[in-house]
Amino acid sequence: PYVPVSAAAQTVQGDYGVFDTMDQAVEAAYLAQKAYQAGFQLRDRERLIKSIRETGIKNAEKLARMSVDETGLGRYEDKILKNMLVLERTPGTECLRTEAISGDDGLTIVEHSPYGVIGAITPVTNPTETIINNVISMLSGGNSVVFNVHPSAKEVCRFAVQMINRAI
């Protein structure tokens, strides 16, 4: 059975997905994923992913500028292209189709289900691109995600996480 990380974490409120401790973030992600799995159908996930994509596209240049300025890595123009690539091309719910396989031994049905809370790290080289890609993939699958961001990109990652949480 699940045991909460801490009693305090049960009532903690993050700042649009940003928390003071990893325990608080994991607890919030666990509770959010359970509610997400129980209360959101595939079409609801599609709506959320669409909102994330639209919001990200509006902020692609800002994300690129913040990333280059904070990390000192990469080229602004390339960061815009990379952000747009993950926003427009990361597979979403369209990959989650039920398959039926029949053969001599009977029928097998393959249906994807959520894993739960997923932990992810972000590299300093592509912090916002990684967050966007992972969020689209993981939310499409009915999961939640907790990011441990690279310290040299923490402000741009904070902005990206909060932007995404505001979009949904």
Residue ranges with predicted function:
Residues P1-I109:
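N-terminal Rossmann-like NAD(P)+-binding subdomain of aldehyde/semialdehyde dehydrogenases
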Residues L96-A167:
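Conserved small-residue-rich beta-alpha loop and adjacent elements
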